[in-house]
Each structure stands twice: as C-alpha cells, then as structure tokens.
Amino acid sequence: MEELRTLPEYLKASNADGTVILQATATWCSQCKAIAPFVEKLVKQFPEAKFYKYDTDSAGDIAQELGVSQMPVFTIFQNGDLEETVTGARGKALEETIRKVYKGEVRQGDGE
C-alpha cells in the first residue's frame, strides 16, 4: 500500500478516478496494527480500488484536512468525491462500506 506524505500527494490521490481508500494510521496505533492484515485482504479483494495510507504524525496536514481525530480512520472516495468514512478497526463495516461504493471487479475473499 502506497504511503502519502504530503498534502499535494493526498489531493492527487483523492481526486483520482475510481475508488480510493485512505487509511489514517500512526506507528503507535495498536488498532491500526491489528487491522493491517485484514486491510491487505481487502487490497486483493478489490483489485481496481486504490489503497493508500498516511501517518497522522508525519502527515498531519492530511489528517487536519480530513478532520481525523482518532484512528484508524478509512476515508473512501469515488471519482474525487468523499463518499464514506469508517472509524475504528471494524473490518466487516469497512468491507461492507467499500462494497457500497466500489464499482470494479470483486475477487472472492473471506473478509475476516
């Protein structure tokens, strides 16, 4: 998963065509680490979606732009429009939310 480090990188990624999922994370965030394997499954399950992460400590301007105050937070864009936000390490909720927005091929995955 590519890491966004600057506000211009975020703007380019979030305005891309298709489905874009941004994950707010931090090195000290235990829930972020706990959900990481599940997110990797989602990357494979939704191959046409673009997944990015950003560290709220080193890329605080991105977190501020999105109003992130807790983690993990997943912000889902479709064709440049912010569609949904999922807060917390809630794998099933994240998967269901991506399914609502995503328009591409879905590969079979067992979710959790």
What name fits each language-model region?
Residues 76-111:
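Non-catalytic, surface beta->alpha helical segment in thiol-disulfide oxidoreductase systems
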Residues 3, 11-41:
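Local sequence-structure signature of Cys/Sec-based thiol-disulfide redox active-site neighborhoods
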Residues 1, 111-112:
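N-terminal targeting signals for export/organelle localization
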Residues 9-10, 62:
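Short alpha-helical segment
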Residues 66-75:
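Structural micro-motif
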Residues 17-20, 47-50, 70, 82:
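Core residues of folded domains in eukaryotic genome-function proteins
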Residues 4-5, 24, 36-61, 68:
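Thiol-based oxidoreductase modules, predominantly thioredoxin-like and allied folds used
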